[in-house]
Amino acid sequence: MTIQKLHFLASENNDAQKHKDIFEKKYGSCAIDGAEAIIALGGDGFMLETMKSNMDHKLPIFGINHGSVGFLMNASNDLDLIDRVNASQSITISPLKMSAVTPDGKEHTAMAINEVSLLREMHQAAKIKISIDGKVRIDEL
């Protein structure tokens, strides 16, 4: 399938916003529900945020660096964006699912792309069990 319908998202960075406007004028912009791909303009943090907030859409995300380093992003250049998206190599990322149970038995779950962190509001020691794919790796931390 050739991707044609793009949905553009940009970080608050002025350069990212400027390029979003340029791309939307050149390629048009689809509502996310009608898009075939998401174009994320920003840095690595924006890419991670875009991936997490758009998991339910199950769309490929093509990142273009308008941040500082951009390890997760493609370089910004003047080549045809549709051609670049269609020529890109796809990778699948499996998000992490974090489940936490409070002392009173209430369960909380969250999905994460890059990392999971826990914050406590008390000074008591935390009892943490780590399981990966249903197998206990650390019984108590």
Please give the residue ranges for each predicted region.
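Short, contiguous, well-ordered secondary-structure segments
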Residues: L48-M51, I130-I132
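ATP/NTP phosphate-donor binding region
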Residues: M1-A37, L41, E49-S53, S76-I91, ...
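Short phosphate-engaging motifs
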Residues: D15, F46, R137
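Short glycine-rich anion-binding loops that position phosphate/pyrophosphate groups of nucleotides
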Residues: G43-F46, G67-V69
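Catalytic core of DAGKc-family lipid kinases
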Residues: F71-L141
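Proline-centered loop/turn at the N-terminus of a beta-strand
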Residues: K58-P60
